[in-house]
Protein backbone atom coordinates (compact mmCIF):
# COMPACT_ATOMS: atom_id res chain seq x y z
CA UNK A 1 0.00 0.00 0.00
CA UNK A 2 1.40 3.37 -0.97
CA UNK A 3 1.34 6.40 1.31
CA UNK A 4 1.52 10.14 0.77
CA UNK A 5 4.06 12.54 2.21
CA UNK A 6 2.84 14.47 5.20
CA UNK A 7 1.03 11.59 6.95
CA UNK A 8 2.17 10.05 10.20
CA UNK A 9 3.25 6.80 8.52
CA UNK A 10 5.06 8.46 5.60
CA UNK A 11 7.33 5.93 3.98
CA UNK A 12 8.10 6.15 0.23
CA UNK A 13 6.41 6.97 -3.03
CA UNK A 14 5.49 4.40 -5.65
CA UNK A 15 7.22 1.49 -3.95
CA UNK A 16 4.49 -0.95 -4.86
CA UNK A 17 4.48 0.24 -8.46
CA UNK A 18 8.25 -0.22 -8.79
CA UNK A 19 8.70 -3.56 -7.12
CA UNK A 20 9.98 -5.17 -10.29
CA UNK A 21 12.83 -2.61 -10.49
CA UNK A 22 14.01 -3.12 -6.91
CA UNK A 23 17.09 -5.37 -6.73
CA UNK A 24 16.63 -8.51 -4.64
CA UNK A 25 17.83 -8.42 -1.03
CA UNK A 26 17.18 -4.72 -0.59
CA UNK A 27 15.73 -3.78 2.80
CA UNK A 28 13.72 -0.65 3.43
CA UNK A 29 13.52 1.02 6.80
CA UNK A 30 10.58 2.99 8.06
CA UNK A 31 11.98 6.48 8.43
CA UNK A 32 10.22 9.80 8.49
CA UNK A 33 10.78 11.77 5.32
CA UNK A 34 10.12 15.51 5.15
CA UNK A 35 9.93 17.53 1.98
CA UNK A 36 12.18 20.59 1.78
CA UNK A 37 10.74 24.05 2.12
CA UNK A 38 9.65 25.59 -1.18
CA UNK A 39 12.06 28.03 -2.77
CA UNK A 40 9.49 30.83 -2.63
CA UNK A 41 9.03 30.59 1.16
CA UNK A 42 12.75 30.49 1.94
CA UNK A 43 14.24 33.43 3.81
CA UNK A 44 16.72 35.67 2.05
CA UNK A 45 18.83 36.15 5.18
CA UNK A 46 22.50 35.62 4.27
CA UNK A 47 23.08 34.07 7.69
CA UNK A 48 20.50 31.44 6.85
CA UNK A 49 23.10 29.47 4.96
CA UNK A 50 25.26 29.15 8.05
CA UNK A 51 22.51 27.47 10.01
CA UNK A 52 22.78 23.79 10.77
CA UNK A 53 20.99 21.54 8.32
CA UNK A 54 17.76 20.00 9.39
CA UNK A 55 18.08 16.50 10.79
CA UNK A 56 16.63 14.79 7.75
CA UNK A 57 17.89 11.23 7.29
CA UNK A 58 19.62 10.37 4.04
CA UNK A 59 17.69 8.07 1.76
CA UNK A 60 19.26 4.81 0.67
CA UNK A 61 20.67 4.46 -2.91
CA UNK A 62 17.74 2.32 -3.99
CA UNK A 63 15.32 4.79 -2.52
CA UNK A 64 16.94 7.72 -4.33
CA UNK A 65 16.26 5.97 -7.62
CA UNK A 66 12.72 4.82 -6.90
CA UNK A 67 11.11 7.72 -5.09
CA UNK A 68 10.00 10.95 -6.60
CA UNK A 69 12.09 12.82 -4.02
CA UNK A 70 15.34 11.93 -5.72
CA UNK A 71 15.99 15.61 -6.44
CA UNK A 72 17.29 15.90 -2.88
CA UNK A 73 21.04 15.74 -2.49
CA UNK A 74 22.77 13.71 0.17
CA UNK A 75 23.84 16.88 1.99
CA UNK A 76 20.36 17.60 3.26
CA UNK A 77 18.13 20.29 1.85
CA UNK A 78 20.18 21.26 -1.21
CA UNK A 79 18.51 20.84 -4.58
CA UNK A 80 20.50 19.89 -7.70
CA UNK A 81 20.37 22.35 -10.56
CA UNK A 82 21.33 22.07 -14.24
CA UNK A 83 24.29 24.47 -13.91
CA UNK A 84 26.81 21.63 -13.87
CA UNK A 85 25.16 20.04 -16.89
CA UNK A 86 25.36 23.34 -18.80
CA UNK A 87 29.07 23.57 -18.01
CA UNK A 88 29.55 20.05 -19.32
CA UNK A 89 27.72 20.89 -22.53
CA UNK A 90 30.09 23.80 -23.22
CA UNK A 91 33.03 21.45 -23.07
CA UNK A 92 31.52 19.01 -25.55
CA UNK A 93 33.22 19.23 -28.92
CA UNK A 94 32.28 17.84 -32.29
CA UNK A 95 33.27 14.36 -33.44
CA UNK A 96 35.49 15.82 -36.12
CA UNK A 97 37.64 17.53 -33.48
CA UNK A 98 37.92 14.22 -31.62
CA UNK A 99 39.00 12.26 -34.68
CA UNK A 100 42.14 10.21 -34.42
CA UNK A 101 43.86 12.05 -37.25
CA UNK A 102 43.57 15.46 -35.59
CA UNK A 103 44.59 13.96 -32.25
CA UNK A 104 47.72 12.60 -33.92
CA UNK A 105 48.69 16.06 -35.15
CA UNK A 106 48.12 17.55 -31.69
CA UNK A 107 50.12 14.67 -30.21
CA UNK A 108 53.10 15.50 -32.42
CA UNK A 109 52.93 19.16 -31.37
CA UNK A 110 52.79 18.20 -27.68
CA UNK A 111 55.69 15.76 -28.06
CA UNK A 112 57.74 18.44 -29.78
CA UNK A 113 57.11 20.87 -26.92
CA UNK A 114 58.05 18.25 -24.31
CA UNK A 115 61.31 17.17 -25.99
CA UNK A 116 62.67 20.55 -27.10
CA UNK A 117 64.86 21.24 -24.05
CA UNK A 118 65.14 17.67 -22.76
CA UNK A 119 68.41 15.75 -22.99
CA UNK A 120 66.84 12.32 -22.41
CA UNK A 121 63.80 13.09 -24.66
CA UNK A 122 61.59 11.22 -22.23
CA UNK A 123 57.89 12.08 -22.10
CA UNK A 124 55.11 11.29 -19.66
CA UNK A 125 51.84 10.21 -21.27
CA UNK A 126 49.66 11.73 -18.56
CA UNK A 127 51.36 15.09 -19.02
CA UNK A 128 50.89 14.89 -22.78
CA UNK A 129 47.22 13.91 -22.40
CA UNK A 130 46.65 16.78 -19.96
CA UNK A 131 48.25 19.20 -22.39
CA UNK A 132 46.08 17.87 -25.22
CA UNK A 133 42.97 18.08 -22.97
CA UNK A 134 42.00 14.48 -23.76
CA UNK A 135 41.85 11.25 -21.84
CA UNK A 136 44.90 9.06 -21.64
CA UNK A 137 43.20 6.12 -23.32
CA UNK A 138 42.60 8.22 -26.43
CA UNK A 139 46.31 8.41 -27.22
CA UNK A 140 47.15 4.73 -26.71
CA UNK A 141 46.47 3.89 -30.36
CA UNK A 142 48.77 6.70 -31.47
CA UNK A 143 51.49 5.47 -29.12
CA UNK A 144 51.19 1.91 -30.47
CA UNK A 145 51.57 3.14 -34.06
CA UNK A 146 54.59 5.19 -33.02
CA UNK A 147 56.10 2.08 -31.46
CA UNK A 148 55.54 0.19 -34.71
CA UNK A 149 57.40 2.96 -36.58
CA UNK A 150 60.31 2.86 -34.06
CA UNK A 151 59.54 6.44 -33.04
CA UNK A 152 58.86 5.71 -29.35
CA UNK A 153 60.16 3.14 -26.89
CA UNK A 154 58.68 2.37 -23.49
CA UNK A 155 61.08 2.92 -20.56
CA UNK A 156 58.76 2.81 -17.54
CA UNK A 157 55.09 2.89 -16.65
CA UNK A 158 53.52 5.76 -18.64
CA UNK A 159 57.01 6.92 -19.65
CA UNK A 160 58.27 6.70 -23.22
CA UNK A 161 61.44 7.85 -24.92
CA UNK A 162 60.96 9.77 -28.14
CA UNK A 163 63.35 8.58 -30.86
CA UNK A 164 61.84 10.46 -33.79
CA UNK A 165 60.94 9.45 -37.33
CA UNK A 166 64.21 10.39 -39.00
CA UNK A 167 65.09 6.73 -39.65
CA UNK A 168 61.75 5.98 -41.30
CA UNK A 169 63.21 5.36 -44.83
CA UNK A 170 65.47 2.62 -43.40
CA UNK A 171 62.47 1.01 -41.67
CA UNK A 172 60.53 1.02 -44.95
CA UNK A 173 63.49 -0.62 -46.69
CA UNK A 174 63.54 -3.43 -44.11
CA UNK A 175 59.76 -3.92 -44.30
CA UNK A 176 59.87 -4.15 -48.10
CA UNK A 177 62.56 -6.84 -48.01
CA UNK A 178 60.65 -8.78 -45.37
CA UNK A 179 57.48 -8.67 -47.48
CA UNK A 180 59.31 -10.06 -50.51
CA UNK A 181 60.83 -12.87 -48.43
CA UNK A 182 57.43 -13.93 -47.08
CA UNK A 183 55.87 -13.97 -50.53
CA UNK A 184 53.38 -11.27 -49.61
CA UNK A 185 53.05 -9.85 -53.18
CA UNK A 186 51.77 -13.24 -54.45
CA UNK A 187 49.21 -13.46 -51.65
CA UNK A 188 47.95 -9.96 -52.37
CA UNK A 189 47.69 -10.79 -56.07
CA UNK A 190 45.69 -13.95 -55.40
CA UNK A 191 43.26 -12.12 -53.14
CA UNK A 192 42.76 -9.38 -55.74
CA UNK A 193 42.13 -11.95 -58.47
CA UNK A 194 39.67 -13.86 -56.29
CA UNK A 195 37.69 -10.71 -55.49
CA UNK A 196 37.58 -9.59 -59.12
CA UNK A 197 36.56 -12.98 -60.60
CA UNK A 198 33.39 -15.06 -60.74
CA UNK A 199 33.18 -18.31 -58.77
CA UNK A 200 30.75 -21.12 -59.53
CA UNK A 201 28.67 -22.25 -56.58
CA UNK A 202 27.27 -25.81 -56.45
CA UNK A 203 23.73 -26.44 -55.29
CA UNK A 204 23.34 -27.98 -51.84
CA UNK A 205 20.88 -30.45 -53.40
CA UNK A 206 23.15 -31.50 -56.22
CA UNK A 207 22.43 -35.21 -55.71
CA UNK A 208 18.85 -34.79 -56.93
CA UNK A 209 20.04 -34.63 -60.52
CA UNK A 210 18.79 -32.51 -63.38
CA UNK A 211 15.98 -30.87 -61.39
CA UNK A 212 18.44 -28.48 -59.74
CA UNK A 213 20.01 -27.35 -63.00
CA UNK A 214 17.69 -25.04 -64.92
CA UNK A 215 17.91 -25.07 -68.71
CA UNK A 216 20.09 -28.18 -69.12
CA UNK A 217 19.59 -31.95 -69.37
CA UNK A 218 21.86 -34.02 -67.14
CA UNK A 219 21.55 -37.74 -66.53
CA UNK A 220 20.71 -38.99 -63.09
CA UNK A 221 24.01 -40.86 -62.85
CA UNK A 222 26.10 -37.73 -63.23
CA UNK A 223 28.16 -36.76 -60.22
CA UNK A 224 27.78 -33.26 -58.77
CA UNK A 225 30.55 -30.80 -59.32
CA UNK A 226 32.57 -29.28 -56.51
CA UNK A 227 33.12 -25.56 -56.14
CA UNK A 228 36.29 -24.29 -57.75
CA UNK A 229 37.77 -20.88 -58.20
CA UNK A 230 38.05 -19.22 -61.61
CA UNK A 231 41.82 -18.81 -61.56
CA UNK A 232 44.43 -21.55 -61.91
CA UNK A 233 47.02 -20.17 -59.53
CA UNK A 234 45.11 -21.26 -56.41
CA UNK A 235 45.43 -24.99 -55.74
CA UNK A 236 44.54 -26.99 -52.64
CA UNK A 237 47.20 -29.46 -51.53
CA UNK A 238 46.38 -32.44 -49.40
CA UNK A 239 48.63 -32.70 -46.35
CA UNK A 240 48.80 -35.24 -43.53
CA UNK A 241 46.69 -34.67 -40.44
CA UNK A 242 49.71 -34.33 -38.12
CA UNK A 243 51.31 -31.67 -40.30
CA UNK A 244 48.05 -29.73 -40.48
CA UNK A 245 47.63 -29.83 -36.68
CA UNK A 246 51.19 -28.64 -36.11
CA UNK A 247 50.78 -25.89 -38.67
CA UNK A 248 47.50 -24.74 -37.12
CA UNK A 249 49.16 -24.37 -33.69
CA UNK A 250 52.00 -22.33 -35.20
CA UNK A 251 49.60 -20.16 -37.18
CA UNK A 252 47.46 -19.58 -34.09
CA UNK A 253 50.47 -18.52 -32.03
CA UNK A 254 51.74 -16.37 -34.91
CA UNK A 255 48.29 -14.90 -35.45
CA UNK A 256 48.02 -13.93 -31.81
CA UNK A 257 51.25 -11.96 -32.09
CA UNK A 258 50.21 -10.34 -35.35
CA UNK A 259 46.89 -9.19 -33.96
CA UNK A 260 48.61 -6.54 -31.85
CA UNK A 261 48.23 -3.01 -33.13
CA UNK A 262 51.95 -2.48 -33.64
CA UNK A 263 52.43 -5.67 -35.67
CA UNK A 264 49.26 -4.97 -37.67
CA UNK A 265 50.62 -1.53 -38.56
CA UNK A 266 53.91 -2.99 -39.79
CA UNK A 267 52.22 -5.62 -41.91
CA UNK A 268 49.86 -3.04 -43.38
CA UNK A 269 52.88 -1.07 -44.57
CA UNK A 270 54.38 -4.31 -45.91
CA UNK A 271 51.26 -4.88 -48.03
CA UNK A 272 51.58 -1.39 -49.50
CA UNK A 273 55.32 -1.70 -50.14
CA UNK A 274 54.99 -5.14 -51.76
CA UNK A 275 53.59 -3.53 -54.92
CA UNK A 276 55.82 -1.76 -57.46
CA UNK A 277 56.69 1.89 -57.02
CA UNK A 278 54.06 3.35 -59.35
CA UNK A 279 51.14 1.22 -58.07
CA UNK A 280 51.64 1.18 -54.31
CA UNK A 281 47.97 1.11 -53.43
CA UNK A 282 45.61 -1.44 -51.96
CA UNK A 283 41.91 -1.51 -51.20
CA UNK A 284 40.54 -1.87 -47.72
CA UNK A 285 38.91 -5.24 -48.48
CA UNK A 286 42.12 -6.74 -49.85
CA UNK A 287 44.24 -5.42 -46.99
CA UNK A 288 41.82 -6.66 -44.33
CA UNK A 289 41.54 -10.08 -45.98
CA UNK A 290 45.31 -10.51 -46.16
CA UNK A 291 46.07 -9.12 -42.70
CA UNK A 292 43.17 -10.26 -40.53
CA UNK A 293 42.04 -13.54 -42.15
CA UNK A 294 43.78 -16.60 -43.54
CA UNK A 295 42.48 -16.73 -47.13
CA UNK A 296 43.48 -20.36 -47.73
CA UNK A 297 41.48 -21.64 -44.74
CA UNK A 298 38.80 -18.97 -44.18
CA UNK A 299 38.14 -18.02 -47.79
CA UNK A 300 38.50 -14.79 -49.71
CA UNK A 301 35.45 -13.02 -48.33
CA UNK A 302 36.37 -9.73 -46.61
CA UNK A 303 36.04 -9.75 -42.82
CA UNK A 304 33.34 -7.88 -40.98
CA UNK A 305 33.65 -4.19 -40.23
CA UNK A 306 34.00 -4.83 -36.53
CA UNK A 307 37.15 -6.88 -37.16
CA UNK A 308 38.53 -4.12 -39.39
CA UNK A 309 38.12 -1.45 -36.73
CA UNK A 310 41.74 -1.62 -35.61
CA UNK A 311 42.88 -1.35 -39.21
CA UNK A 312 40.80 1.83 -39.54
CA UNK A 313 42.62 3.40 -36.57
CA UNK A 314 46.01 2.52 -38.03
CA UNK A 315 45.09 4.00 -41.40
CA UNK A 316 43.84 7.22 -39.79
CA UNK A 317 47.10 7.73 -37.89
CA UNK A 318 49.20 7.02 -40.99
CA UNK A 319 47.11 9.48 -43.00
CA UNK A 320 47.70 12.15 -40.35
CA UNK A 321 51.46 11.48 -40.50
CA UNK A 322 51.47 11.91 -44.28
CA UNK A 323 52.64 8.35 -44.99
CA UNK A 324 49.51 7.26 -46.87
CA UNK A 325 46.45 8.95 -48.33
CA UNK A 326 42.91 7.77 -48.84
CA UNK A 327 41.54 7.93 -52.38
CA UNK A 328 38.19 6.69 -53.68
CA UNK A 329 37.96 4.67 -56.88
CA UNK A 330 35.08 3.18 -58.82
CA UNK A 331 34.85 -0.59 -59.12
CA UNK A 332 32.03 -0.97 -61.63
CA UNK A 333 29.34 1.18 -60.03
CA UNK A 334 30.58 0.80 -56.45
CA UNK A 335 32.77 3.37 -54.75
CA UNK A 336 35.64 1.73 -52.85
CA UNK A 337 38.41 3.39 -50.79
CA UNK A 338 42.05 2.75 -51.68
CA UNK A 339 45.09 3.54 -49.56
CA UNK A 340 48.01 4.93 -51.57
CA UNK A 341 51.51 5.07 -50.13
CA UNK A 342 53.00 8.58 -50.27
CA UNK A 343 55.73 8.33 -47.62
CA UNK A 344 59.50 8.31 -48.05
CA UNK A 345 61.12 5.91 -50.48
CA UNK A 346 62.74 2.84 -48.92
CA UNK A 347 66.41 3.70 -48.46
CA UNK A 348 69.03 2.59 -45.95
CA UNK A 349 70.68 6.01 -45.75
CA UNK A 350 67.66 8.31 -46.16
CA UNK A 351 66.07 10.62 -43.59
CA UNK A 352 62.54 11.89 -42.99
CA UNK A 353 61.11 15.00 -41.32
CA UNK A 354 57.64 14.23 -40.05
CA UNK A 355 56.88 17.81 -38.96
CA UNK A 356 57.60 19.09 -42.47
CA UNK A 357 55.28 16.43 -43.87
CA UNK A 358 52.48 17.46 -41.52
CA UNK A 359 52.96 21.14 -42.35
CA UNK A 360 52.75 20.28 -46.05
CA UNK A 361 49.48 18.47 -45.46
CA UNK A 362 48.03 21.36 -43.46
CA UNK A 363 49.06 23.95 -46.04
CA UNK A 364 47.50 22.00 -48.92
CA UNK A 365 43.72 22.32 -49.06
CA UNK A 366 43.37 19.12 -51.09
CA UNK A 367 45.35 16.83 -48.77
CA UNK A 368 44.04 17.93 -45.37
CA UNK A 369 43.54 14.69 -43.39
CA UNK A 370 39.88 14.34 -42.50
CA UNK A 371 40.15 10.80 -41.08
CA UNK A 372 36.68 9.21 -41.03
CA UNK A 373 35.12 12.01 -43.07
CA UNK A 374 35.22 11.68 -46.86
CA UNK A 375 36.75 14.63 -48.65
CA UNK A 376 34.12 16.87 -50.17
CA UNK A 377 36.00 17.41 -53.40
CA UNK A 378 36.67 13.70 -53.97
CA UNK A 379 33.09 12.81 -53.14
CA UNK A 380 31.80 15.39 -55.61
CA UNK A 381 34.01 14.07 -58.41
CA UNK A 382 32.99 10.48 -57.70
CA UNK A 383 29.30 11.40 -57.75
CA UNK A 384 29.67 13.11 -61.10
CA UNK A 385 31.48 10.11 -62.60
CA UNK A 386 29.09 7.55 -61.15
CA UNK A 387 26.02 9.56 -62.14
CA UNK A 388 24.69 10.08 -58.60
CA UNK A 389 24.47 13.86 -58.98
CA UNK A 390 22.69 14.12 -62.34
CA UNK A 391 21.56 17.46 -63.67
CA UNK A 392 18.65 18.30 -65.85
CA UNK A 393 20.76 20.02 -68.52
CA UNK A 394 24.48 19.53 -68.63
CA UNK A 395 26.92 21.77 -70.43
CA UNK A 396 27.17 19.31 -73.28
CA UNK A 397 23.40 19.27 -73.77
CA UNK A 398 23.31 23.06 -73.80
CA UNK A 399 25.80 23.21 -76.67
CA UNK A 400 23.80 20.77 -78.79
CA UNK A 401 20.92 22.21 -80.87
CA UNK A 402 17.50 21.08 -79.80
CA UNK A 403 15.27 19.29 -82.29
CA UNK A 404 12.24 21.48 -81.47
CA UNK A 405 14.08 24.77 -81.96
CA UNK A 406 12.85 26.50 -85.16
CA UNK A 407 15.52 27.50 -87.63
CA UNK A 408 15.51 31.03 -89.07
CA UNK A 409 15.90 31.18 -92.83
CA UNK A 410 18.80 33.34 -93.89
CA UNK A 411 18.34 35.72 -96.84
CA UNK A 412 21.51 36.28 -98.78
CA UNK A 413 21.45 39.03 -101.38
CA UNK A 414 24.31 40.67 -103.25
CA UNK A 415 22.50 44.01 -103.26
CA UNK A 416 22.34 44.17 -99.47
CA UNK A 417 25.59 45.25 -97.90
CA UNK A 418 26.68 43.52 -94.71
CA UNK A 419 26.92 45.85 -91.74
CA UNK A 420 28.76 45.17 -88.44
CA UNK A 421 25.47 44.82 -86.64
CA UNK A 422 24.36 42.26 -89.16
CA UNK A 423 27.56 40.27 -88.75
CA UNK A 424 27.40 40.21 -84.95
CA UNK A 425 23.75 39.38 -84.43
CA UNK A 426 22.56 36.30 -86.28
CA UNK A 427 18.95 36.76 -85.16
CA UNK A 428 18.52 40.15 -86.87
CA UNK A 429 15.42 40.56 -88.99
CA UNK A 430 16.63 40.52 -92.58
CA UNK A 431 13.53 42.22 -93.99
CA UNK A 432 14.19 45.30 -91.87
CA UNK A 433 17.79 45.34 -93.04
CA UNK A 434 16.68 45.38 -96.67
CA UNK A 435 14.19 48.18 -96.00
CA UNK A 436 16.72 50.28 -94.12
CA UNK A 437 19.40 49.79 -96.76
CA UNK A 438 16.98 50.72 -99.54
CA UNK A 439 15.94 53.91 -97.72
CA UNK A 440 19.57 54.86 -97.12
CA UNK A 441 20.41 54.20 -100.77
CA UNK A 442 17.55 56.42 -101.91
CA UNK A 443 18.71 59.25 -99.64
CA UNK A 444 22.23 58.99 -101.01
CA UNK A 445 20.87 59.01 -104.57
CA UNK A 446 18.86 62.21 -103.95
CA UNK A 447 21.83 63.91 -102.31
CA UNK A 448 24.13 63.11 -105.23
CA UNK A 449 21.51 64.25 -107.73
CA UNK A 450 21.11 67.61 -106.02
CA UNK A 451 24.87 68.01 -105.79
CA UNK A 452 25.26 67.26 -109.49
CA UNK A 453 22.71 69.95 -110.41
CA UNK A 454 24.59 72.48 -108.31
CA UNK A 455 27.88 71.58 -109.94
CA UNK A 456 26.42 71.83 -113.44
CA UNK A 457 25.05 75.29 -112.68
CA UNK A 458 28.37 76.58 -111.39
CA UNK A 459 30.49 74.96 -114.12
CA UNK A 460 28.52 76.69 -116.84
CA UNK A 461 29.91 80.09 -115.79
CA UNK A 462 33.58 79.14 -115.35
CA UNK A 463 35.97 79.94 -118.15
CA UNK A 464 38.46 77.18 -117.40
CA UNK A 465 35.99 74.52 -118.45
CA UNK A 466 35.72 74.67 -122.24
CA UNK A 467 34.48 71.15 -122.71
CA UNK A 468 31.48 69.42 -121.21
CA UNK A 469 31.94 66.82 -118.54
CA UNK A 470 32.65 63.34 -119.77
CA UNK A 471 30.99 60.29 -118.48
CA UNK A 472 34.08 59.24 -116.54
CA UNK A 473 34.25 62.56 -114.66
CA UNK A 474 30.64 62.69 -113.59
CA UNK A 475 30.12 61.30 -110.08
CA UNK A 476 26.72 59.73 -110.85
CA UNK A 477 27.24 58.44 -114.39
CA UNK A 478 26.71 54.86 -113.29
CA UNK A 479 23.37 55.71 -111.71
CA UNK A 480 21.87 58.58 -113.87
CA UNK A 481 21.22 58.21 -117.61
CA UNK A 482 22.94 60.79 -119.85
CA UNK A 483 20.78 63.82 -120.65
CA UNK A 484 20.62 65.28 -124.20
CA UNK A 485 22.40 68.63 -123.96
CA UNK A 486 23.13 71.25 -126.59
CA UNK A 487 26.68 72.52 -126.90
CA UNK A 488 27.32 75.36 -124.54
CA UNK A 489 28.30 78.76 -126.01
CA UNK A 490 30.17 80.59 -123.31
CA UNK A 491 31.50 84.09 -123.98
CA UNK A 492 35.21 84.64 -123.80
CA UNK A 493 36.37 86.73 -120.89
CA UNK A 494 39.15 89.28 -121.27
CA UNK A 495 42.46 88.14 -119.98
CA UNK A 496 43.87 90.01 -117.02
CA UNK A 497 47.29 89.78 -115.41
CA UNK A 498 47.76 87.16 -112.74
CA UNK A 499 48.68 89.49 -109.84
CA UNK A 500 45.42 91.40 -110.32
CA UNK A 501 43.27 88.36 -111.07
CA UNK A 502 42.20 87.78 -107.51
CA UNK A 503 41.19 91.41 -106.94
CA UNK A 504 39.51 92.48 -110.23
CA UNK A 505 37.93 89.23 -111.40
CA UNK A 506 34.14 89.38 -111.60
CA UNK A 507 31.64 87.30 -113.48
CA UNK A 508 30.15 89.13 -116.46
CA UNK A 509 26.41 89.55 -116.67
CA UNK A 510 25.28 86.92 -119.11
CA UNK A 511 21.87 85.64 -119.98
CA UNK A 512 20.77 82.36 -118.46
CA UNK A 513 21.22 79.57 -121.01
CA UNK A 514 18.10 77.84 -122.14
CA UNK A 515 18.09 74.18 -123.00
CA UNK A 516 15.89 72.85 -125.80
CA UNK A 517 14.78 69.23 -125.51
CA UNK A 518 12.95 68.11 -128.66
CA UNK A 519 11.64 64.90 -127.09
CA UNK A 520 10.24 66.65 -124.05
CA UNK A 521 6.49 67.36 -124.00
CA UNK A 522 4.97 68.95 -120.93
CA UNK A 523 2.18 67.04 -119.30
CA UNK A 524 -0.65 68.77 -117.55
CA UNK A 525 -0.63 68.37 -113.84
CA UNK A 526 -3.19 65.98 -112.43
CA UNK A 527 -2.81 67.14 -108.89
CA UNK A 528 -6.19 67.71 -107.29
CA UNK A 529 -6.76 70.39 -104.67
CA UNK A 530 -7.02 69.47 -101.04
CA UNK A 531 -10.35 69.04 -99.35
CA UNK A 532 -9.74 72.18 -97.33
CA UNK A 533 -9.18 74.15 -100.57
CA UNK A 534 -12.33 72.88 -102.32
CA UNK A 535 -15.44 75.13 -102.54
CA UNK A 536 -18.97 73.86 -102.48
CA UNK A 537 -22.16 75.71 -103.61
CA UNK A 538 -24.34 76.86 -100.83
CA UNK A 539 -27.65 75.06 -100.48
CA UNK A 540 -30.81 77.01 -100.98
CA UNK A 541 -32.79 78.10 -98.00
CA UNK A 542 -35.81 76.19 -99.27
CA UNK A 543 -34.14 72.87 -98.63
CA UNK A 544 -33.51 73.79 -95.03
CA UNK A 545 -37.09 74.85 -94.55
CA UNK A 546 -38.55 71.61 -95.91
CA UNK A 547 -40.01 69.21 -93.44
CA UNK A 548 -38.09 66.05 -94.12
CA UNK A 549 -40.14 62.99 -93.33
CA UNK A 550 -38.84 59.48 -92.86
CA UNK A 551 -38.66 57.58 -96.11
CA UNK A 552 -40.19 54.44 -94.67
CA UNK A 553 -43.60 56.08 -94.14
CA UNK A 554 -46.36 55.07 -96.52
CA UNK A 555 -47.34 58.66 -97.30
CA UNK A 556 -43.77 59.46 -98.22
CA UNK A 557 -43.64 56.48 -100.56
CA UNK A 558 -46.91 57.52 -102.27
CA UNK A 559 -45.73 61.10 -102.55
CA UNK A 560 -42.51 60.01 -104.22
CA UNK A 561 -44.51 57.86 -106.61
CA UNK A 562 -46.62 60.83 -107.71
CA UNK A 563 -43.54 63.00 -108.15
CA UNK A 564 -41.86 60.40 -110.29
CA UNK A 565 -45.08 60.04 -112.36
CA UNK A 566 -45.21 63.72 -113.02
CA UNK A 567 -41.59 63.61 -114.17
CA UNK A 568 -42.63 60.93 -116.70
CA UNK A 569 -40.84 58.18 -114.87
CA UNK A 570 -41.84 54.71 -116.00
CA UNK A 571 -41.56 53.32 -112.50
CA UNK A 572 -44.88 53.39 -110.59
CA UNK A 573 -45.76 51.46 -107.47
CA UNK A 574 -49.42 51.02 -108.34
CA UNK A 575 -49.00 49.48 -111.80
CA UNK A 576 -45.49 48.35 -112.57
CA UNK A 577 -44.22 47.12 -109.20
CA UNK A 578 -44.33 43.50 -108.27
CA UNK A 579 -45.91 44.54 -104.99
CA UNK A 580 -48.60 47.12 -105.67
CA UNK A 581 -49.39 49.66 -103.00
CA UNK A 582 -53.08 50.33 -102.53
CA UNK A 583 -54.60 52.97 -100.32
CA UNK A 584 -56.97 52.02 -97.60
CA UNK A 585 -60.52 51.58 -98.81
CA UNK A 586 -59.56 51.41 -102.50
CA UNK A 587 -60.23 48.24 -104.48
CA UNK A 588 -58.92 47.15 -107.81
CA UNK A 589 -60.40 44.57 -110.14
CA UNK A 590 -58.85 41.20 -110.14
CA UNK A 591 -57.21 40.09 -113.31
CA UNK A 592 -57.05 36.68 -114.78
CA UNK A 593 -53.89 34.75 -114.02
CA UNK A 594 -51.60 34.83 -117.03
CA UNK A 595 -53.10 37.93 -118.62
CA UNK A 596 -50.62 40.36 -120.06
CA UNK A 597 -50.79 43.62 -118.21
CA UNK A 598 -50.27 46.99 -119.73
CA UNK A 599 -47.13 48.45 -118.23
CA UNK A 600 -47.61 51.91 -119.76
UniProtKB/Swiss-Prot annotation:
It holds the Pfam family E2F_TDP. The keyword ATP-binding does not apply. Residues 35-65 are annotated as: Disordered. GO terms for biological process: negative regulation of gene expression; regulation of transcription by RNA polymerase II. It is found in: Nucleus. Residues 39-50 have a biased composition (Basic and acidic residues). One of its GO terms (molecular function) is RNA polymerase II cis-regulatory region sequence-specific DNA binding. Gene3D superfamilies: Winged helix-like DNA-binding domain superfamily/Winged helix DNA-binding domain. Keywords: Developmental protein, DNA-binding, Nucleus, Transcription, Transcription regulation. Its main location: nucleus. One of its GO terms (cellular component) is RNA polymerase II transcription regulator complex. Transmembrane segments: none annotated. Disruption phenotype: RNAi-mediated knockdown on a ced-3 mutant background results in ectopic egl-1 expression in posterior ventral nerve cord neurons. RNAi-mediated knockdown on a simultaneous lin-39; ced-3 mutant background results in ectopic egl-1 expression in midbody and posterior ventral nerve cord neurons. Residues 95-164, 253-343 bind DNA. Belongs to the E2F/DP family. PANTHER family: TRANSCRIPTION FACTOR E2F, TRANSCRIPTION FACTOR EFL-3. Probable transcription factor which represses gene expression in a subset of ventral nerve cord neurons. Involved in regulating programmed cell death and determining cell fate during development, acting in a partially redundant manner with lin-39 to repress the BH3 domain-encoding gene egl-1 in the VA and VB motor neurons. This is Transcription factor efl-3. It comes from Caenorhabditis elegans.
